[in-house]
Amino acid sequence: MTNFLLASLPIATILFLMIKANWGAARAGAAAWFVTVILAVFFFGAPTDMLIIAQAKGVMLALYILYIVWAALILYFAAEEAGAIKTIGRAIRSLTDDRPLQLLILGYVFASFLQGVAGFGVPIAVVAPLLLGMGFSPVLAVAAPMIGHSWSVLFGNMATSFEALIGVTGIPGTELTHYSAILLGLSGFMCGAAVLWLDGGFRTIRRRIVPLVLISGVMGVVQYFMANYGVWTLGGLTAGIAGLVASIIVTRFWKPHPDDVAEQVADDHQHMPLIEALTPYLVFIVLVTMATFVPAVEMLLGKIRFTLDFPETATANGWVIEAESAKAIAIFGHPGALLLYTAAISFTFFKLRGHYDDGIGKRIWQRTLKSGLPTSIGMVPVIGLAIIMDHAGMTYALAEGGAAVFSGAFAIAYPVIAPAIGALGA
């Protein structure tokens, strides 16, 4: 039990610094990393070479993920600066006069789509202003997308969270997708219901249960099949697109309740056709499909890979980490590379169509730096912390202590606590 308590200190440190001391994630993560190193050396017998190896693996995993993050941000800002995101938002807003359904489509469906495209706060940053402009309260405008997109995090943004899960656990993705996708599909329904509840409680949910079931069902099924057929990098994106298509169909037949007709809000003229606004994401889907299902393309893009080989290492307490290679990065076939190709094509397309002002390249890069740097700085120490804990046997100590606590009559309670532990890790 002593090892269990010691191994929990890094997590306790992050919680205390972020909740009580109001530190940012990057600063708190760095402090917790320092605590982890001290514990690993003095209480778990981790040698210096193990710490170096663990941190090097953490950097490699961070590079794998950050390649996606930065490329996704570049693509998003290239589309946003052209007006594509606003065009998509306006198109959704014009689908129906039903206020709760507008909230569901924007705060749930469109937010899920944006999570599939970019993630990292983008759904809230984009959807909240749209909802404010439609007359929703500030609290509702922020809360709806914050709740609505959360089910799509694992397979959203090119499945960066899922890739991190695979990298940290070493479990093949094919063994994780089935139950993950089922649970997320059910969570998606609950997220949609929660968004409706925000606007009018259970009465609003009852009145919109048919659109909710249809839209959430379509998104859940599409995500399930994409994930289980090995294309989990597109799971969140395709689910979002399917949800948008389902929303368009549903609104054709759905008549708003007289009490819930939304007020008309003045809007500026829409200069960009919807199909033009969707071009970046259609291009991206084509590129990913070719890179995944065309063997010649997959082989060509995957030729040049960057990885590092790490030797076996062990703690003084006998905890052994076998020799292994870091998660390889296919320089030209990595999901981040596909996003960069898409960004380049989209930028050229929008430039030729006259949607950019002077200085657009500098503006996109500045916005990317502003959004990407905090994420990058915070990610490296936290991933390093997780791998150091794993290599020093601290994660095993947590699992062993947890198994001891949730044993016997308390074993049934563990599935209830497990999601909270996962949220804590996130």
What residue spans do the PLM features occupy?
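Membrane-interfacial loop-to-helix junctions in multi-pass transporters
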Residues: F4, L61-I65, I92-L106, M134-L140, ...
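Alpha-helical transmembrane segments of multi-pass membrane proteins
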Residues: P100-S112, P138-W151, P172-G192, G408-G422
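Membrane-core helix-loop-helix motifs of multi-pass transport proteins
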Residues: M134, M146-R252, M272-I275
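Flexible loop linkers connecting adjacent transmembrane helices
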Residues: M50, A54, A78-T96, G173, ...
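Hydrophobic alpha-helical transmembrane segments of multi-pass integral membrane proteins
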Residues: D98-P129, G133, V153, S376-I388, ...
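Transmembrane helical segments that form the transport core of multi-pass membrane transport proteins
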Residues: A262-A418, G425
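Structural signature of hydrophobic alpha-helical transmembrane segments
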Residues: M1-L9, A62-I65, V117-P123, T174-F189, ...
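Hydrophobic mid-bilayer segments of alpha-helices in multi-pass membrane transport proteins
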Residues: L6-L15, W23-F44, L66-A72, L212-S216, ...
